[in-house]
Amino acid sequence: MPGRARTRARGRARRRESYQQEAPGGPRAPGSATTQEPPQLQSTPRPLQEEVPVVRPLQPRAARGGAGGGAQSQGVKEPGPEAGLHTAPLQERRIGGVFQDLVVNTRQDMKHVKDSKTGSEGTVVQLLANHFRVISRPQWVAYKYNVDYKPDIEDGNLRTILLDQHRRKFGERHIFDGNSLLLSRPLKERRVEWLSTTKDKNIVKITVEFSKELTPTSPDCLRYYNILFRRTFKLLDFEQVGRNYYTKKKAIQLYRHGTSLEIWLGYVTSVLQYENSITLCADVSHKLLRIETAYDFIKRTSAQAQTGNIREEVTNKLIGSIVLTKYNNKTYRVDDIDWKQNPEDTFNKSDGSKITYIDYYRQQHKEIVTVKKQPLLVSQGRWKKGLTGTQREPILLIPQLCHMTGLTDEICKDYSIVKELAKHTRLSPRRRHHTLKEFINTLQDNKKVRELLQLWDLKFDTNFLSVPGRVLKNANIVQGRRMVKANSQGDWSREIRELPLLNAMPLHSWLILYSRSSHREAMSLKGHLQSVTAPMGITMKPAEMIEVDGDANSYIDTLRKYTRPTLQMGMSCLLVFKVICILPNDDKRRYDSIKRYLCTKCPIPSQCVVKKTLEKVQARTIVTKIAQQMNCKMGGALWKVETDVQRTMFVGIDCFHDIVNRQKSIAGFVASTNAELTKWYSQCVIQKTGEELVKELEICLKAALDVWCKNESSMPHSVIVYRDGVGDGQLQALLDHEAKKMSTYLKTISPNNFTLAFIVVKKRINTRFFLKHGSNFQNPPPGTVIDVELTRNEWYDFFIVSQSVQDGTVTPTHYNVIYDTIGLSPDTVQRLTYCLCHMYYNLPGIIRVPAPCHYAHKLAYLVGQSIHQEPNRSLSTRLFYL
């Protein structure tokens, strides 16, 4: 099946009581929630997050009110008795995201790396990183003040406007994040109260209370520097879209399939403390916009609808899309369409009066709604950590004012336009280096930017940071009776083309199901399989060819018919049948139904392939991959790598959060169950929406250890866990609730015999490395390790560039060993990690993360996207999700 983009939302809870009471379940109008930005064309990691000034700006609500006539945007009620003298201390707002992780010192408990965490293996190379050293920073203590509003103001812009009325009292040298104020000099009093006036003459009391002093290098102070730096984008006329800033000045326009596309150039930045210095990390980001409103999309889809139920077809295509509202540059995910309401309907304002959506947008945003009879889009906003159990209030949007983002299915299937988009967004190392150099020079040359940074004595080096790296040797790969290595591109497909598999499984009782239109492709598949399996060592009997109607039910009914006798005899279908389904197209509902049946009710190793895939010129190569996948799903193995460790179980954990359909979150757990790393145990844990920490790890680990003991007749000595899918700010919780709990459980089994290492894997990072050759820049070769300069003294961490990319700039992966009772040396853990990147059976090449991590991702994704329930346990020892 075609790749389906993985989506993930991570947010931070913010608890603050509003002066208005929410109506239970009442939908609200647009602009009132922090939202997930749409997937970007170029895979860019999440930017460093400062505490944003606002979580839910005050906006009109459809079942009650919220809009007033505030300063520039909306107003507030007159303060009542509750706005009297406020004597209780203001609540300290916690720092969020990555800044929480910076204060977690995990290295201090690992004595074996107390003096040094730097390895020595490999060939030394000199690299450049997209980091720029801070060469000047404040040397004075800064003063943090908490800021509170009565009545509470949720709109970040309005909070800033009201505070700015008193700017002469605290001066130009200040940084405000919406909740707290950082000053270079203290106020005369620890606590002050100021009165501000909104545009409609309402009075708001602002209480400013001293919180603490901050040293220039404290994580909280660094957070303010990031907020300050983001101000520079506004001075450069960049527009904020989601969390990042983009410019329209260099927009690239394309037109395909009746849709105009626009690519905006932007940047992701962060200022953080590393081993020897504070640096500014800057990377290029792109935002893809369709010059098409949601209303245009609804009209076009309605005109092209092929079914009688036009509304259902429009809803199915629009749900899950990301739209941009240009009046506030926010992005929203469409969760539903309210066909019963239109812009002429009314909602209640905060003063109890009613206003239509048309009038609201004209008054508040100067937007004119010309189409009266259009439905309203419904967005549920974004769930936040700590508040996943609370009911979210829907946000209502007008389609005419919502601009579509991302790519349509028609565009995605057009190779020429995808290639054209990649040309503009997948920047080569040379182009990326040049673009970033231009950006840094622009900052340096802009007078307003210089003046802003000089207020805080901040100055950045304009040269890319130079860092040493080491290139490790590729792992020894054993297949058949031969040992091979990956080539310079991290691939060994040529080297193993005619070699037998390490452990080939016979293919005897198997079925090929196909629709009438796919008969030719089915016969071709059968013939190719017979020719490609012999060199692999797979013995194969002729398949039973079964023609079906092509809909999901016809596939399932046929499978039920063929498996019923086996089930009635009390036998497992897993031992009898293997299935290949040729699908007429890539309809997701058909695929999901078939996979759900074959992974839950009737567990059978299965492979689904779209007819169009078998029509390609390289059909034989594709069939070879199908045969290899089927071999793995039946319990076989393609190759193994030499790890030089004894009796060690490797575990991968990853989480999938289905934020499109608001389904449960899925944690995938995959563990090796033999010493050669060729057998695996897989289990998933279904959790609450947005939950990242896995609660049932002990159960998963026990089951995996039981399978290991069955395969090896004894327990492993060590367990090494690679944990992916963790958001910023979760490091301490991960250490307490997963790493230490697993260690405690292992001690209950055998207090002295088990050792554990727990490694956090992070793919979504902004750091890039360049290898310079003369005046040119290239990607570092696979196996490049960086464990100095851009690592942290408090962590046992390192980067590895494990994969090779044909287009664009390679993204390294960051590893952080947060718990280790094994005593892994830097060279050992780096070499092991790189070796495991050779063990993903879907590709004869090196991948970006260790194989157990990627297996866990594939498992969680299949369950979260297609199955939506726990797979049958009889499949747990098979890689059925490849």
Curated annotation (Swiss-Prot):
Gene Ontology BP annotations: cell differentiation; meiotic cell cycle; piRNA processing; regulation of translation; regulatory ncRNA-mediated gene silencing; spermatogenesis
Function description: May play a role during spermatogenesis by repressing transposable elements and preventing their mobilization, which is essential for the germline integrity. Acts via the piRNA metabolic process, which mediates the repression of transposable elements during meiosis by forming complexes composed of piRNAs and Piwi proteins and govern the methylation and subsequent repression of transposons. Directly binds piRNAs, a class of 24 to 30 nucleotide RNAs that are generated by a Dicer-independent mechanism and are primarily derived from transposons and other repeated sequence elements.
Keywords linked to the UniProt accession: Cytoplasm, Developmental protein, Differentiation, Meiosis, RNA-binding, RNA-mediated gene silencing, Spermatogenesis, Translation regulation
This protein's record includes keyword Metal-binding: no
Listed name of the protein: Piwi-like protein 3
Composition bias type Polar residues, residue spans: 32-46
Boundaries of every Piwi domain copy: 578-868
Originating organism: Homo sapiens (Human)
Signal peptide stretch: none
Biased composition (Basic residues): 1-15
Single GO term (MF): piRNA binding
Tissue specificity as recorded in UniProt: Expressed in testis.
A Pfam family matched in the record: PAZ
Positions of region (Disordered): 1-91
Domain PAZ: start-end pairs: 293-406
Family, similarity comment: Belongs to the argonaute family. Piwi subfamily.
Upper lineage: Eukaryota, Metazoa, Chordata, Craniata, Vertebrata
Record field: transmembrane: none
Keyword Cytoplasm: yes
InterPro entries with a match to the protein in the record: PAZ_dom, PAZ_dom_sf, Piwi, RNaseH-like_sf, RNaseH_sf
Localisation: Cytoplasm
Any one annotated GO CC term: nucleus
Main location group: cytoplasm
